[in-house]
Every structure is written in C-alpha cells, then in structure tokens.
Design a protein with these regions (language model features):
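Intrinsically disordered, low-complexity and often Lys/Arg-enriched segments
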Residues: 1-8, 78-88
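Short N-terminal "domain-start" leader segments
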Residues: 1-37
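A generic structural signal for ordered alpha-helices
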Residues: 4-7, 16, 40, 44-47, ...
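A positively charged, amphipathic N-terminal helix/segment that binds anionic biomolecules
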Residues: 20-21, 72, 80-85
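Short aromatic-glycine-(Arg/Gly/Cys) micro-motifs in beta-strand/loop hairpins
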Residues: 25-53, 67
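A short, charged, amphipathic alpha-helix used as a generic interaction element across diverse proteins
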Residues: 48-50, 56-74
Length: 88
C-alpha cells in the first residue's frame, strides 16, 4: 500500500527468444527516524534475486537517485536488448 511517504515501481523485461526474464522493483519510503530509504530488488523472474536498501537524509536527494535508477531502466534496450515494461 502506498502512503504519501512511499512510492513504488515494478518492471519486467521478458523475451523468450533471448532467454531474458528479469524483474526490477523500486520502493521509496520514509522510515521511523525521518530518513528516506530506497529499496531495490532485481533478478531473474521466479528467483529470490538481490536487494539493496540505501538511506538518505532527505526526500529530495532520494528522488534524484530514484530518477537516475528509472532512467537506467529505460535504457535497458541498449544494454540487454529487451525493454523493461511497467507492471501494475
């Protein structure tokens, strides 16, 4: 559930002919201490994958980092040959 203090994005890149089935999730939330955290999870669909959580002292900094991450997902077609699509 998203609150005014949280946002999330979910993407998948699927191409059976290239054996590509990737998922990428991004969450921005405010923790109990007022810091903004960015949690990223990625990996092959159906696996545990990897996760990284990073904390920032303010929301503005976290928003800049999140925008950079979203921009990188948009460039996947150049890197892996398959475009990430938003999953609702």
């Amino acid at each position: 559930m998203e609150t005014p203090f949280s946002q999330s994005w979910h993407w998948q890149a699927i191409d059976p002919s290239r054996n590509v089935a990737r998922a990428y999730d991004l969450w921005i939330e405010t923790d109990l201490f007022g810091w903004t955290t960015i949690e990223r999870r990625w990996g092959r669909i159906g696996t545990k994958g990897r996760a990284v959580t990073t904390s920032y002292p303010d929301r503005a900094t976290a928003d800049v980092i999140a925008k950079e991450i979203r921009t990188r997902r948009e460039s996947a077609i150049k890197r892996i040959g398959v475009r990430y699509r938003a999953v609702v």
